[in-house]
Amino acid sequence: MFKGTPEIVTQRREEIVNACEELYQTKSFKEINLKEIGAVTSFSRPTIYNYFQTKEEIFLALYEREYDRWNAELESILNSGQNFSRKQVAEKIAMSLERRAQLLRLLSMNNFDMEANSREELLASFKRAYGRSLDLFRKILEKYCPEMSSEEVKEIMYVFFPFMFGIYPYAEVTDKQRKAMEEADVDYIYHSIFEITYNCLIRLLDR
């Protein structure tokens, strides 16, 4: 790791992650490499190795940042000061994920590669952000659904968080995939991230 001031290290890491995020808007995980990321930053590719050893570590940092952003939204729901109904809780959480399509994309498509090819300390940092999401989600259910037992809350979480892996592929369909579905005569109804998430949550909460 580069032995600069904490401010410089943070600034450089942020610039690298921002470059990765910019490329990820138009390219796939496999298409992006360190050379391309370096071309978007203000410094050379060798400098990147002072902060990240692999492409996957950069994506993991982006992934962690996406969880941090979602956590901020979950905190807002938790601390709203309002008494939400179960329907409103489902709507609020679904809308929070509607705004986090990039998080769901990373989760569904690149999760294994990022974790497998990153150093343990960076993976631990990411897991803390992920763990915060679990904690906030649990607290939201405990606050707005107080009649639920702790076991019921756990059961909902064990269903919903694995369910999140499949949201993006169902909601974000490419033109090629859509055309193939039409040619295969598959009667498929397309739904948004919000719709898919809400429909799952309202069924889990109203059991």
Predicted regions and their residues:
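Basic, helix-initiating cap at the start of DNA-binding domains
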Residues: 1-27, 35-36, 40, 79-81
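Helix-turn-helix
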Residues: 15, 30-57, 61
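Alpha-helical DNA-contacting segments of helix-turn-helix folds
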Residues: 59-66, 115
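Hydrophobic alpha-helical connector segments
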Residues: 61, 75-103, 156-160
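N-terminal hydrophobic signal/anchor transmembrane helix of membrane proteins
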Residues: 70, 85-105, 190-207
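Amphipathic alpha-helical segments used for helix-helix packing
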Residues: 99-121, 175-180
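C-terminal peripheral helix-coil segments that are non-catalytic and often amphipathic
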Residues: 135-139, 143, 147, 163-207
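Membrane-interface starts of transmembrane alpha-helices
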Residues: 145, 149-157
